[in-house]
Curated annotation (Swiss-Prot):
It catalyses: a 2'-deoxycytidine in DNA + S-adenosyl-L-methionine = a 5-methyl-2'-deoxycytidine in DNA + S-adenosyl-L-homocysteine + H(+). Disulfide bonds: none annotated. This is DNA (cytosine-5)-methyltransferase 1. Methylates CpG residues. Preferentially methylates hemimethylated DNA. Associates with DNA replication sites in S phase maintaining the methylation pattern in the newly synthesized strand, that is essential for epigenetic inheritance. Associates with chromatin during G2 and M phases to maintain DNA methylation independently of replication. It is responsible for maintaining methylation patterns established in development. DNA methylation is coordinated with methylation of histones. Mediates transcriptional repression by direct binding to HDAC2. It comes from Bos taurus. Residues 752-877, 969-1097 form the BAH domain.
Amino acid sequence: MPARTAPARVPALASRAFSLPDDVRRRLKDLERDSLTEKECVKEKLNLLHEFLRTEIKNQLCDLETKLHKEELSEEGYLAKVKSLLNKDLSLENGAHAFSREANGCLENGSQTSGEDCRVVMAEKGKPPKPVSRLYTPRRSKSDGETKSEVSSSPRITRKTTRQTTITSHFPRGPAKRKPEEEPEKVKSDDSVDEEKDQEEKRRRVTSRERVAGLLPAEEPGRVRPGTHMEEEGRDDKEEKRLRSQTKEPTPKHKAKEEPDRDVRPGGAQAEMNEGEDKDEKRHRSQPKDLASKRRPEEKEPERVKPQVSDEKDEDEKEEKRRRTTYRELTEKKMTRTKIAVVSKTNPPKCTECLQYLDDPELRYEQHPPDAVEEIQILTNERLSIFDANESGFESYEDLPQHKLTCFSVYCKRGHLCPIDTGLIEKDVELLFSGSAKPIYEDDPSPEGGINGKNFGPINEWWIAGFDGGEKALLGFSTSFAEYILMDPSPEYAPLFSVMQEKIYISKIVVEFLQSNPDSTYEDLINKIETTVPPCMLNLNRFTEDSLLRHAQFVVEQVESYDRAGDSDEQPIFLSPCMRDLIKLAGVTLGKRRAERRQTIRQPAKEKDKGPTKATTTKLVYQIFDTFFAEQIEKDDKEDKENAFKRRRCGVCEICQQPECGKCKACKDMVKFGGSGRSKQACQKRRCPNMAMKEADDDEEVDDNIPEMPSPKKMHQGKKKKQNKNRISWVGDAVKTDGKKSYYKKVCIDSETLEVGDCVSVIPDDSSKPLYLARVTALWEDSSNGQMFHAHWFCAGTDTVLGATSDPLELFLVDECEDMQLSYIHSKVQVIYKAPSENWAMEGGVDPEALMSEDDGKTYFYQLWYDQDYARFESPPKTQPTEDNKYKFCASCARLAEMRQKEIPRVVEQLQDLEGRVLYSLATKNGVQYRVGDGVYLPPEAFTFNIKLSSPVKRPRKEPVDEALYPEHYRKYSDYIKGSNLDAPEPYRIGRIKEIFCSKKSNGRPNETDIKIRVNKFYRPENTHKSTPASYHADINLLYWSDEEAVVDFKAVQGRCTVEYGEDLPQCLQDFSAGGPDRFYFLEAYNAKSKSFEDPPNHARSTGNKGKGKGKGKNRTKSQTCEPSELETEIKLPKLRTLDVFSGCGGLSEGFHQAGISETLWAIEMWDPAAQAFRLNNPGSTVFTEDCNVLLKLVMAGEVTNSRGQKLPQKGDVEMLCGGPPCQGFSGMNRFNSRTYSKFKNSLVVSFLSYCDYYRPRYFLLENVRNFVSFKRSMVLKLTLRCLVRMGYQCTFGVLQAGQYGVAQTRRRAIILAAAPGEPLPLFPEPLHVFAPRACQLSVVVDDKKFVSNITRLSSGPFRTITVRDTMSDLPEIRNGASALEISYNGEPQSWFQRQLRGSQYQPILRDHICKDMSALVAARMRHIPLAPGSDWRDLPNIEVRLSDGTLARKLRYNYHDKKNGCSSSGALRGVCSCVEGKPCEPAARQFNTLIPWCLPHTGNRHNHWAGLYGRLEWDGFFSTTVTNPEPMGKQGRVLHPEQHRVVSVRECARSQGFPDTYRLFGNILDKHRQVGNAVPPPLAKAIGLEIKRCMLAKARESASAKIKEEAAKD
């Protein structure tokens, strides 16, 4: 807009006018440049201006300060009133400020001095008078005694750089508040826009009259001058009418309310900024010339303006009287209206065109190049033509010419520089641009040789090119006349364009990264972004996570565009885990149509995906997968076709709502387009991305609260069937008569003879179900039930966890049997036992023989026994009938009876018969013997201690929070904090058995069903008066003896443990504790009454109970307790030769080494940094860094070494195979189709199973993420188990929580264990430590059946939980970005856990205590996260902060009404985007570089408020699952140190996984984080290893026992 002037009425000279000294004025300007808060700024200015204020004003300021201190006035109200008082005191009577510093005859606020004064000033300067800019005069202020009214002026703005300075110009401006009836978050209504057009038309008419009259003299009577009270009153009338029509309430014409920190903009929310804005100082001095050059010829300024003075005193008095009357009416109406109106914070004023905030200090204006001409003139310039006169121009008139444009700027009609990617073009806002046009072949970005142009456009479309792997990404505009490829922006536009370039380059990074890493996580993507060096043209040091989140919408749209170039059956890369997390975090809107976006992606078509690489498989594995897939693909593809149309559309997004294209393959098959209608597929242009996202998320979501599922269905028959005596007859005489039952050996049914031991098919009650199969174990007849048989059931493969993947002819033994009537028998069948061959271990990799030659419908086979509750496949139990019970022997009954007998508590070895009770020396339960003097585990509720501890730590009550400072704190309504141990249960109580007794019945006999034990209580350190801090420094297995006793039910005993007096041990305490499980020691006794520690009494030091055991106490008890340990030391087990596939840095192998069961001779790891780390920690291992498929192919081909000369393990060499194959390659979609089946068939899981089949190791372990058991409706799990069963392995699966095995981290892992025939199948290890119950939901649902592992310690454990404090409190303090690879510890270990991890180093050096260097903004956020437990991003203050790089982080604006969360207690808004009002997201609402990340409140309502992001760890809590890249906004969430302003270090993460401090890592910091995050926690691996060791010991004992028997038999 050109600067204009308007004749102004000359005010009378003020009675009191003064000017500020120059030094004060300078200091006021300096304050504006400083980054002070509004409060600080006002305070400083008051100090400067205090001596210039009248006494009356000073008194009023004192009163205001008193009210503020008494909280009678809010801080905002106080600041508003202070500015109001200053505005009054330092202004003239008519509102014109009276400072004596003039510029061009005008005052700062647009009021004009009298012509006389103007001439005097010019004469004094000795210069000819310059043209006076025509300015709009603001409304006049009220007199000092009245309340001020809203200031408003016409939107004409002066853009002079030298302007009059006023006091109020030194205060920050803010938006005017809307009237109460107006919705604060709504954009200007159509009525107000029309009204503004009317106002503009009025101004044009006045201006044209001015031109006709030439130079207007002093204002004529009756003439309405723009900016005067009469025009303002007219505008107010219109506004009042509009509001009345909306609210149907009386509406005042003025609004006196002012927002405390903002002045009202001239012309309301749609007008330009007032003249007082200091941003004009940032413009070039040539701007007035440029602006003038834009005007139409008839709008040119006159050469000279000579304002005349006329006497208007009468008119002034009338206007003043009318104005005061109007103001009183307004005030009365306002008071009435505010009683019912909701007063809330309103939007700051915006430009009506580009919707930018007019008070934004970064708002810029366009500046045309010199001598700029219009677009049409440029396009006809011969310098841009690439043809000579003899050449034809274009092949078609539809082709647009292409040129290059440099030194360009893009702006709206009001002259504001605008970005092009905020949705303005899509909303038909006309954006123009200027610059220097050059021929298309020019590469020089300088404006030399170009043609300067202005007002190009409007822009119809913008497009991107350069996604071809090159270094550059190009941006172009299309207008109605030409296309322009952009080169360099103008200096003014460069900051805006750099943001655009930044997002283009980030999109390029993301697309190219996903091309090669489609299964990457969000943390992996952040790693890629942060490690990519930005192009030099961007003037950026680094890309950050904030950069990605800022441009997330744009980036996702580019990825969607890339996916559209692929085939319809290809997996979209926008469904990769990292993109799904980005879409959720940033609140990206999917499914925007490109046509509506007016954005074109000009890039080469997506390269054809060649599909997955071929996996090397053995014949057995290949046959299983191929056979099953052939049937399942057809079935699932049929289901997909039936459900695709409904399933793939949400019906809400833009893509779903557009019509079919009629051109794609799916449309051509539709009936409406003349097709057959068979495929029933959605139009390819209507493939809903929201539904695809939902399906991908559903595949990975696992419900922690698994509902109660019915147990696997039993095969009981519910009712009797009528006997048919004619078809059933006994063969031979009864072999045995037992009471009423007569047992037979044979029976004839329908001319078919059956005998005991035969197998039969049984008719089910439900005829729709297949026949049941059973072994006949007894035949008898009795008078009540008739002819009966005892059925020992077989379980069909489909009734196991294998489901449909099982062999249809394979059966499994189960411990399930029942009595049945013979009439239920359908026919005789044959069930063959397939025993493993003697050479089983060497048969791997060869062509598998068919287990059954053909299916005749009556022949089946079985190999294994199946546990239906624990999903365990084991070798059939060896139970043989005796001669006297062959006629009715049932292996199932025998085993079930044996188990019941074991479970029943019993007493043995009576000691003494006392009055009322009988004492015993021994009791048994679950096969475990408990003697007097043994230590026992008891539930926490078994007994209490005689000391009253302080109540457990609870969260402090929530105190009132300043919602203005902490606007997101309201989201913390839940007390639950992820990573907190407040709900962690207590560990077991431990007691030493003093007596075992039973009370006597009334008949004098002992009641052996009610066994009691009397125990001496042991105190743990946390149970003493020293409470929890004592346990932190003490050993985890330290106890204190006490003479306190308790009587407990023997049924409550949870297990046996060893408790020894430390001074009596032959070895050191550390060796004793490490020598076996369940070991405790005590050195002192605790007296609860005196709260003192004493020497233990003599009877405590003895492991027996003197005088009670009649010589069976001390010695025998000790030998009984230590018996397993002695056997372990006697039998030396050879270590298993181990191959670790997908080894990573070696966490699994490290745990097995600590358990002492394996020696890892070979490892395969393709990622070089992890392979190097494995080498560092396992120097004797051969580490292969090749593809596992290549290695297996070499071995199967008979090769001995690989290409690098490394010796390959041969068949028979590998005794243990372990690994965690990555399975993300097929984790994107919940349903299989032919392509995902193909991916799975060639996945690393299949390769790993092929390794198992070829090498046939004694033990096999597969470790993976918890969701492994749920992928593809558990299909991955089923097929893995199916392969193992087909190989002949015993196998099982379960989910373990690493936190229960001694790490301060929640990490649930799926484990598949397998053992070769003849080896005992290990159980899963019982938990060692208590842990948060929420993280211990370990059951698995497969096909609506709930499976659990064999673990029995569900509610407690032997040891307390390990905390963050235990893990890392001894590590020295470091800063953000610390990079010293080796430092000293600076202190001794403080906890038991730290002593374990530090080990016994001679000269301890702390390695890898380094942390990521976060960006300046992230560092500032971390610095402002409080240190209180549970703190996260919701505790960030909404303030401006100076960052370490010198930039300023802004406050977050809340401009929208959040329908869900409402307003704050002070009425402030809580929404940051229009989506909270139920509207589509507004691109212009995005905010960046704010201390509170804009994306989190934007999407928080639908993502649990992003609890935990930017969260601090809690000293007494635990880590979330350690990931590969600790990011404050990543999945792991709480990664900030509890007390230091940084993310956790590599060493802290390694400790959270349980790695010893001596364990070496390799590579840069992100490599090391990835190595740690991908590893199996060694303590978890150790626990599993000890279970394998137990099985090996059991077999060794069995072999030793058999050998002794054999030798004895020979003798």
